[in-house]
């Protein structure tokens, strides 16, 4: 059905406008005098694209910074893995008209595999990087065998929701699983559940825990991380949990049904997200960590203290500067003993001490001190072998220093770049890293990668949190964090992509 939307002069160049047509939300734009209409809702989590930023013909979602072509609807940056629907637009007698329904809204970018191709592409790890790599191989026209190996017997899913929403019993809107079973069947992506115990780059073979082997023409190593254990007496008691998988989250939720008092060990992103989610469930929550300020190493003391105050206002109690020396209880946890001799009562303990790269099977490949692996800008580890996601130390945008970044969107970007290079393309990874963290339905966005900094410049208020934080080293902004600044942080991705040497005042003015 064709809809009269507006007069031709009513939509200014470069403006994003959302309209509802036939029950569908449509995003209308005008670029170089040409009108375009695509879906107005981000397929990742339902973000309102009209509140995003338009840059070089691409709209960046204000929520999680997925990006789409406004001309074709193509998803050009994750975390979205699906394109937007695209609608025909015409201008008749000075009126802009959009047709919704009655025709295919877009051409599926993944054609069915055709032709004879005997090559086998193997992906170890079915998380963000692995799932996107498998999809990209088919999108790029590869017609051979694609094998996606994971340790969990379920479809690849959005791991970010576990600490942010699953523990609270709420839903955040993220699409999970990433694709349904029909997708993998239709595009002949073989899903194997198993544990890889060895990889031989010279012979190009994988060995599984059951002794089976699989040869490959090119392989991607994307196993992600494994939780760092709590090595104290009593850490194996019932009611003590780590959080990495959906099964872990389900076990925590099951324990929470019968718990009243929770101790979270660790004040990093996962620990604080878990604390917030369990507090939203109505439990009494205490957080124990050796550092004096939450997230201080990642965000600095000022922003870290803002997170502490945010959680304290919700009733979370912090025990900082403390080491856990034992978990107390008989068969089931009853308390957490601290280094000062005190004991915190607990019916449930969640351990969030970070993760280490899950690279134990790479005995024939050189590994870093932190168990990661060094890759080049194409994410190549060796001939025919690539690495992506948490395990890959890649040349960071700007200075080229090899850096591991343990964040979902970066892993998805890695998966796409690695897959294209597995097929013989020459694509470098030079994106600006981005991640988000959510606490009590409030989100902090972080663009760039500071590592270390000389100073942090705060624009806004820390308590209550509503700010931009600029991380400055050698008089150049290395990263920007924003709390409650959705649109500005979407713009920051483009600005830091275009220019790598921003002085803080110039970037602050550019963000408005």
Predicted stretch roles:
Residues 1-55, 90-103:
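N-terminal pre-ligand scaffold of iron-sulfur
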Residues 21-22, 143, 182, 187-208, ...:
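A Rossmann-like FAD-binding core segment of flavoenzymes
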Residues 503-512:
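Cysteine/selenocysteine-centered motifs that mediate thiol-based redox chemistry or coordinate metal-sulfur cofactors
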Residues 117-122, 391-488:
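Mid-to-C-terminal Rossmann-like scaffold of FAD/NAD(P)H-dependent oxidoreductases
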Residues 236-257, 331-337, 342-417:
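FAD-site-proximal beta/loop scaffold in flavoenzymes
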Residues 125-129, 244-245, 266-268:
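Glycine-rich Rossmann-fold phosphate-binding loop(s) that bind the pyrophosphate
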Residues 116-190, 228, 275-299, 491:
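Beta1-alpha1 glycine-rich phosphate/pyrophosphate-binding loop at the start
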């Amino acid at each position: 059905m064709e809809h009269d939307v507006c007069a031709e002069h009513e939509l200014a160049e470069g403006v994003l406008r959302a309209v509802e047509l036939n029950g569908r939300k449509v995003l209308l734009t005008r670029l170089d005098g040409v009108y375009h209409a695509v879906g107005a809702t981000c397929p990742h989590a339902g973000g309102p694209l009209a509140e995003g930023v338009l840059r070089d013909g691409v709209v960046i979602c204000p929520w999680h910074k997925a990006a789409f072509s406004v001309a074709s609807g193509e998803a050009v940056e994750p975390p979205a893995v699906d394109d937007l629907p695209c609608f025909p637009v015409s201008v008749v007698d000075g009126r802009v008209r959009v047709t919704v329904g009655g025709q295919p809204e877009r051409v599926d970018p993944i054609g069915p595999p055709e032709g004879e191709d005997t090559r086998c592409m193997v992906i170890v790890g079915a998380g963000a990087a692995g799932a996107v790599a498998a999809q990209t191989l088919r999108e790029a026209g590869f017609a051979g065998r694609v094998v996606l190996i994971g340790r969990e017997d379920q479809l690849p899913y959005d791991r970010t929701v576990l600490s942010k929403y699953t523990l609270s019993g709420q839903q955040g809107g993220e699409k999970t699983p990433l694709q349904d079973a029909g997708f993998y069947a239709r595009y002949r992506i073989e899903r194997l559940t198993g544990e890889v115990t060895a990889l031989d780059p010279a012979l190009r073979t994988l060995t599984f825990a059951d002794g089976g082997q699989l040869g490959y023409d090119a392989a991607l190593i994307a196993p992600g991380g494994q939780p760092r254990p709590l090595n104290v007496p009593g850490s194996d008691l019932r009611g003590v949990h780590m959080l990495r998988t959906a099964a872990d989250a389900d076990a925590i939720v099951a324990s929470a049904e019968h718990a009243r008092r929770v101790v979270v060990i660790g004040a990093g992103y996962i620990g604080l997200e878990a604390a917030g989610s369990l507090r939203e469930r109505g439990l009494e929550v205490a957080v124990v960590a050796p550092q004096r300020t939450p997230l201080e190493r990642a965000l600095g003391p000022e922003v870290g203290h803002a997170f502490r105050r945010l959680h304290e206002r919700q009733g979370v109690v912090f025990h900082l500067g403390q080491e856990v020396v034992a978990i107390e209880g008989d068969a089931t946890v009853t308390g957490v003993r601290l280094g000062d001799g005190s004991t915190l009562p607990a019916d449930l303990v969640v351990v969030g001490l970070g993760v280490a790269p899950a690279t134990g099977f790479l005995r024939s490949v050189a590994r870093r001190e932190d168990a990661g692996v060094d890759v080049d800008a194409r994410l190549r580890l060796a001939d025919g072998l690539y690495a992506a996601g948490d395990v890959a130390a890649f040349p960071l945008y700007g200075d080229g220093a090899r850096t591991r970044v343990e964040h979902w969107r970066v892993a998805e970007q890695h998966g796409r770049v690695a897959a294209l290079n597995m097929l013989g393309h020459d694509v470098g990874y030079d994106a600006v890293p981005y991640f988000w963290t959510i606490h009590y339905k409030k989100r902090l966005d972080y663009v760039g990668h500071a590592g270390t900094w000389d100073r942090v410049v705060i624009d806004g208020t820390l308590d209550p949190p509503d700010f931009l934080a600029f991380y400055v080293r050698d008089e150049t902004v290395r990263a920007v964090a924003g709390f409650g600044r959705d649109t500005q942080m979407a713009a920051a991705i483009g600005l830091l992509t275009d220019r790598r040497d921003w002085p803080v005042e110039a970037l602050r003015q550019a963000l408005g």
